[in-house]
A protein has these predicted regions:
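Charged helix-capping and loop-helix junction motifs
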Residues: 34-42, 65-71, 118-124
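Alpha-helical membrane segments in multi-pass integral membrane proteins
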Residues: 52, 60, 70-74, 81-84
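Glycine-rich phosphate-binding active-site loops on the catalytic face of alpha/beta enzymes
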Residues: 1-4, 50-62, 86-87, 97-121
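Catalytic cores of alpha/beta
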Residues: 35-39, 75-79, 83, 87-106
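C-terminal helical cap(s) of enzyme catalytic domains, especially alpha/beta-barrels
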Residues: 12, 71-74, 97, 106-135
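Flexible, glycine-rich phosphate/dinucleotide-binding loops
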Residues: 26-28, 90, 112
């Protein structure tokens, strides 16, 4: 995921690589996502018209309602969708399975030991993998 740049899209296309840009207005660090659900969905449709067939959406970093955005986006967009940002609990993992995106990413929740408080990064990752395997 990164902001959409036509030059990046063209370069990756020339080298047979997939490009999964962010959609909506993304800013800050950690990143936040702004825009109405309709604007974000339209942004994806506009990018699909340029040949983009996969997206990285920072749904839980949305300034309004991340879960609602994720549900509406995945229902409206016929493309690979990876949900990124703040997937930091078993409840949110369950929600990912319910929404059904192509995938989701997880980062800081593993470093901050959200799943095994006294565990290592590897132990936290293993706890998530074990949990998901049972789904």
């Amino acid at each position: 995921g990164t902001l959409y740049y036509e030059s990046v899209h063209n370069y990756l296309k020339e080298h047979n690589m997939t490009y999964s840009p962010f959609v909506g207005k993304v800013s800050g660090s950690p990143s936040i996502l702004e825009g109405t659900n309709e604007e974000i969905i339209q942004n994806a449709k506009d990018l699909m018209a340029k040949g983009i067939d996969a997206f990285d959406i920072l749904a839980y970093r949305h300034v309004v309602d991340g879960e609602k955005l994720a549900r509406e986006f995945c229902a409206a967009i016929d493309a690979k969708v990876a949900i990124a940002g703040s997937i930091s609990s078993y409840e949110r993992i369950d929600t990912m399975f319910d929404i059904g995106p192509w995938g989701f990413t997880m980062g800081s929740a593993l470093f901050t030991k959200n799943f095994v408080p006294d565990g290592s990064f590897k132990e936290n990752l293993q706890a998530v993998a074990d949990y998901m395997e049972k789904k």
